[in-house]
Amino acid sequence: MTQLFYDTDADLSLLNNKTIAIIGYGSQGHAHALNLKDSGMDVIVGLYKGSKSESKAVSDGLQVFSVSEACEKADWIMILLPDEFQKDVYLKEIEPNLKEGKILSFAHGFNIRFGLIKPPSFVDVVMIAPKGPGHTVRWEYQNGQGVPALFAVEQDSSGSARSLAMAYAKGIGGTRAGILETNFKEETETDLFGEQAVLCGGLSELVKSGFETLVEAGYQPELAYFECLHEVKLIVDLMVKGGLSQMRDSISNTAEYGDYVSGKRLINSDTKKEMQKILKDIQDGTFAKNFVEECDKNKPLMTKLREENSKHEIEKVGKGLRSMFSWLK
C-alpha cells in the first residue's frame, strides 16, 4: 500500500533561516503564506504592481514586494499563479533572480511537465500540492487539522530536496493529515484527467443532461435541479467519508438497485474508451498545446463557452432556489 508521511516524518527546522517568497496571493497563496507564517517561517509575498491582493496581504501582516524583488530576497520561491501566467512571469521576474542553492516550487506540475518552464540545473525543483482549495487549507490549519497533500521532486541540486519539500508540506499543515509522494508527470496527468473526465467536465455534463432530460419530459425545473444538482453533494459527501460502499449502505435499497442496473447504461465501455482518448490527449501534450494556444489568443473559445453555459436554464433555476436556502446564505 502507498505510504503516507506525517508530522514525525518531516523536519520543519530545515526551513529555519530561509526566506520563503509566495508568488501570488489568491486562494492557495493566502493559505500557504499564512500557514507558513503561523508555523514560524519567514514569509514574504511577491505581487505585480497594482495587484488587488496587496492590501489584503499587508493587512494579514505580510511584507509585499514586486515579484522580482521577492525572488531576489528569497531562498525558497513558491509559484502560486494561474498556469497560463507562470511562464511569462518566470522568464521576466523569477529566472533572473535564481542562484545556486535556491528552491523553486510549484503546487501543480503543468508548466514543468509540458516544458513551458525549464529551470537551471543549480536549483532544487519541488512540488507541494494540497488536495483542497485554499480556504480549506487555511481553515483546517487554524483548527489544528490539515489537508492531505502531494509532494514531488523534479530536480535535486542540493541533495536535500525531498526533505525540504516534506518540511514545507509540514509548514502548511499537510503532514497533519498525511502527504503522499509522487512525481510531476503523474500529478499533472492525473490532475488534468480528473478535472476533465470526472470532477468538472464529466460531472457538469452529467448534471446538465440529467436536468434537461427531466425538464424536456415535462417535470418542474425546480425538482429537476434538486434531483440532478443539489443532491450531488449529499452523495459525494458519503463517498468521500466512506467510499462507494458506505454511500450504498446509506441510501435506500431502491436507489442502490437503480445504481447497479442503470449506472452502466450511461457509463459503459464506450464512455471508458472516450476517457482513454482524453487521457491520451493529456499524456501526449495535445491538451496542453491547445490550452496554451487558447490563452495566447486571449481565450476566445473559453470566453464563448463560459457565456453560453452561464445562460443554461439550470443556472437560472439554481440561482432562484439557492436564494431561498437559509443554510446557503
Curated annotation (Swiss-Prot):
Residues 2-182 form the KARI N-terminal Rossmann domain. Keywords: Amino-acid biosynthesis, Branched-chain amino acid biosynthesis, Magnesium, Metal-binding, NADP, Oxidoreductase. Its EC number is 1.1.1.86. It comes from Prochlorococcus marinus (strain MIT 9215). It is an enzyme of class 1 (oxidoreductase). The keyword Metal-binding applies. Binds 2 magnesium ions per subunit. HAMAP family: IlvC (MF_00435). Involved in the biosynthesis of branched-chain amino acids (BCAA). Catalyzes an alkyl-migration followed by a ketol-acid reduction of (S)-2-acetolactate (S2AL) to yield (R)-2,3-dihydroxy-isovalerate. In the isomerase reaction, S2AL is rearranged via a Mg-dependent methyl migration to produce 3-hydroxy-3-methyl-2-ketobutyrate (HMKB). In the reductase reaction, this 2-ketoacid undergoes a metal-dependent reduction by NADPH to yield (R)-2,3-dihydroxy-isovalerate. Residues 183-328 form the KARI C-terminal knotted domain. This is Ketol-acid reductoisomerase (NADP(+)).
